[in-house]
Amino acid sequence: EQFEDYGHMRF
């Protein structure tokens, strides 16, 4: 998935 919340950054 592209819109996953990676700690603090969103891709």
From Swiss-Prot:
Where are the Sulfotyrosine modifications?
6
Domain of life, per the record?
A: Eukaryota
Q: What is its main location?
A: secreted
UniProt key word Oxidoreductase = no
Q: Which UniProt keywords apply?
A: Amidation, Hormone, Neuropeptide, Secreted, Sulfation
**Record's subcellular location:** Secreted
Which PROSITE patterns does the record match to this protein?
GASTRIN (PS00259)
User: What InterPro entries does the record point to?
Assistant: Gastrin/cholecystokinin_CS, Sulfakinin
Keyword Membrane carried by entry: no
GO CC terms of this entry = extracellular region
Phenylalanine amide modification sites are 11
Which biological processes are named by the entry's GO terms?
neuropeptide signaling pathway
User: Which Pfam families does the record associate with it?
Assistant: Sulfakinin
Entry's Gene Ontology molecular function annotations: hormone activity
Q: Which family does it belong to?
A: Belongs to the gastrin/cholecystokinin family.
**Primary role:** Changes the frequency and amplitude of contractions of the hingut. Inhibits muscle contraction of hindgut.
This chain belongs to the protein called Sulfakinin-1
